[in-house]
């Protein structure tokens, strides 16, 4: 398969995933934040860690976090050892939202590949990225 065709297929996958991310309730950035805070260890659930993970500014990350807090998906808690720092955790509403995460469409598609295909795909994508 020519490189251009492969690149077009990757672009199409990206568009499909992006389109799935707009569910009318949360934006793709907000979905990414929910996934991050659900997986991160308690000491990494900070605005700075999320900004670094997203490779964005702290201001942009904070806007996403504030929207999720306002929507009742995240709650902010001060660290017991340092009251100036905060840890963010998912609320029950945030956990319920993740149960219907549109990203799972892609996860299921990749899961439909056999182990050899998934390994080859992962290696190829690592090389591309």
Question: How would you label these PLM feature ranges?
Answer:
Residues 15-57:
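N-terminal helix-turn-helix DNA-binding core of bacterial DNA-binding proteins
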Residues 7-11, 119-126:
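Amphipathic alpha-helical segments that line or abut small-molecule/effector binding pockets
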Residues 1-28, 71, 90:
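N-terminal leader segment of winged-helix/HTH proteins
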Residues 5, 12, 32-36, 96:
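Pre-recognition alpha-helix immediately N-terminal to the DNA-recognition helix
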Residues 10-13, 17-20, 54, 97, ...:
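Alpha-helical linker/hinge and terminal dimerization helices associated
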Residues 66-119, 123:
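Charged, amphipathic alpha-helical coiled-coil/dimerization segments
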Residues 47, 65-66:
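Short, hydrophobic-biased segments on the C-terminal half of alpha helices
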């Amino acid at each position: 398969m020519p490189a251009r065709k492969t690149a077009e297929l990757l672009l199409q996958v990206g568009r499909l995933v992006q389109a799935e991310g707009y569910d009318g309730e949360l934006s793709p950035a907000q979905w990414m934040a929910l996934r991050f805070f659900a997986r991160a260890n308690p000491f990494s659930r900070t605005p700075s860690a999320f900004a670094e993970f997203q490779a964005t500014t702290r201001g942009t990350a904070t806007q996403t976090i504030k929207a999720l807090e306002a929507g009742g998906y995240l709650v902010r808690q001060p660290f017991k050892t340092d009251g100036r720092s905060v840890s963010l955790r998912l609320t029950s509403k945030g956990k319920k939202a993740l149960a219907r995460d549109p990203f799972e469409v892609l996860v299921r598609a990749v899961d439909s590949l056999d182990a050899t295909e998934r390994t080859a795909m992962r290696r190829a994508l690592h090389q591309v990225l």
